[in-house]
C-alpha cells in the first residue's frame, strides 16, 4: 500500500478523551497521533490547536484564571532556564526521560494536576519542543478572549527591563498603545527581535538578516 496522503493522515488523527495516560488524564481536543515533522506554518497551527484545547480544559476545570496565571508562570520559567529550554528542544533525550524530568520540575515549582496533565499530554505526543510556542499561542488566545491586543516578542536572550521599556515605547510610536507583550526566548535568532501582532510580522533578527545576505550573495553569484 502506498503512503497515506497528508490530508487523510490528518483526518485519521484521534482526539484525546477523558481517559488517563501515563501522566494523568489526557487534555480533551489534542491530537494523540501526529506526523513527526511539520512546517513552520503547521507548527503555528499545531500550537493554536493545543492552546485551544488547553483553554477548554482549563475552563472545564473551574479554575480558568488560575490556570492562565500558572501557564504564564511556566512560560517565564522556560525563558529563564537555559537548561530547561535545552531539555525541551533536544532530540537526543529519550521522550520518557524528558517528560519525567519536566514533570519533576513542575512538581517542585508547585504546579497543579491541570498543568501536569497538559504537559504530560504534550510530551506523550512528542511535542515538548513546541511547548513554549504553545504557551505563547495560549497567551494570544487568552488576550483575544479578553478583547486585548497582544505582541508576541521573540528574542535571542531575555529582554532587560530597559529593553522592554524601549520596545513598549516603539510599539506605542507605531500605534500599538494598548498592547500586551508576550515574551519568548529563541537563541536561534542570534540577536535582534521578531515581533508578531496579529497577522503583522516585524523581523529585525540577526538570523533573518544573515539569511537575506546569503540569498543576496547567491543571487549575485
Swiss-Prot record:
Stored InterPro entries: ATP_synth_OSCP/delta_N_sf, ATPase_OSCP/d_CS, ATPase_OSCP/dsu
Membrane topology, from the record: Peripheral membrane protein
GO annotation, cellular component aspect: plasma membrane; proton-transporting ATP synthase complex
Ranges annotated as biased composition (Basic and acidic residues): 1-13
Transmembrane segments: none
Major site of localization recorded for this protein: membrane
Spans annotated as Disordered: 1-31
A molecular function (GO) term: proton-transporting ATP synthase activity, rotational mechanism
Localization per Swiss-Prot or TrEMBL: Cell inner membrane
UniProt KW keywords: ATP synthesis, Cell inner membrane, Cell membrane, CF(1), Hydrogen ion transport, Ion transport, Membrane, Transport
Subunit annotation: F-type ATPases have 2 components, F(1) - the catalytic core - and F(0) - the membrane proton channel. F(1) has five subunits: alpha(3), beta(3), gamma(1), delta(1), epsilon(1). F(0) has three main subunits: a(1), b(2) and c(10-14). The alpha and beta chains form an alternating ring which encloses part of the gamma chain. F(1) is attached to F(0) by a central stalk formed by the gamma and epsilon chains, while a peripheral stalk is formed by the delta and b chains.
UniProt record similarity statement: Belongs to the ATPase delta chain family.
HAMAP family for the chain: ATP_synth_delta_bact
Protein's job: F(1)F(0) ATP synthase produces ATP from ADP in the presence of a proton or sodium gradient. F-type ATPases consist of two structural domains, F(1) containing the extramembraneous catalytic core and F(0) containing the membrane proton channel, linked together by a central stalk and a peripheral stalk. During catalysis, ATP synthesis in the catalytic domain of F(1) is coupled via a rotary mechanism of the central stalk subunits to proton translocation.
Protein name: ATP synthase subunit delta
Organism annotation: Granulibacter bethesdensis (strain ATCC BAA-1260 / CGDNIH1)
Classification lineage: Bacteria, Pseudomonadati, Pseudomonadota, Alphaproteobacteria, Acetobacterales
Gene field: atpH
Amino acid at each position: 500500500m502506498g503512503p497515506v496522503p497528508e490530508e487523510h493522515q490528518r483526518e485519521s488523527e484521534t482526539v484525546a478523551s477523558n481517559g488517563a495516560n501515563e501522566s494523568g488524564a489526557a487534555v480533551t481536543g489534542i491530537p494523540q497521533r501526529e506526523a513527526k515533522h511539520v512546517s513552520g506554518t503547521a507548527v503555528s497551527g499545531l500550537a493554536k490547536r493545543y492552546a485551544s484545547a488547553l483553554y477548554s480544559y482549563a475552563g472545564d476545570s473551574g479554575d480558568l484564571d488560575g490556570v492562565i496565571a500558572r501557564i504564564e508562570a511556566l512560560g517565564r520559567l522556560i525563558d529563564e532556564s537555559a537548561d530547561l529550554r535545552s531539555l525541551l528542544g533536544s532530540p537526543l533525550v529519550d521522550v520518557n526521560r524528558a517528560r519525567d524530568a519536566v514533570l519533576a520540575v513542575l512538581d517542585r515549582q508547585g504546579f497543579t494536576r491541570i498543568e501536569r496533565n497538559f504537559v504530560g499530554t504534550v510530551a506523550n505526543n512528542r511535542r515538548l519542543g513546541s511547548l513554549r510556542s504553545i504557551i505563547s499561542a495560549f497567551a494570544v488566545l487568552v488576550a483575544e478572549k479578553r478583547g486585548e491586543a497582544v505582541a508576541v516578542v521573540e528574542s535571542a536572550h531575555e529582554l532587560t527591563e530597559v529593553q522592554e521599556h524601549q520596545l513598549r515605547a516603539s510599539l506605542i510610536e507605531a500605534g500599538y498603545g494598548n498592547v500586551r507583550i508576550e515574551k519568548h526566548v529563541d537563541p536561534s535568532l542570534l540577536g535582534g527581535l521578531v515581533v508578531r501582532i496579529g497577522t503583522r510580522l516585524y523581523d529585525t533578527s540577526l538570523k533573518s538578516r544573515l539569511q537575506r545576505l546569503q540569498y543576496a550573495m547567491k543571487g549575485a553569484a
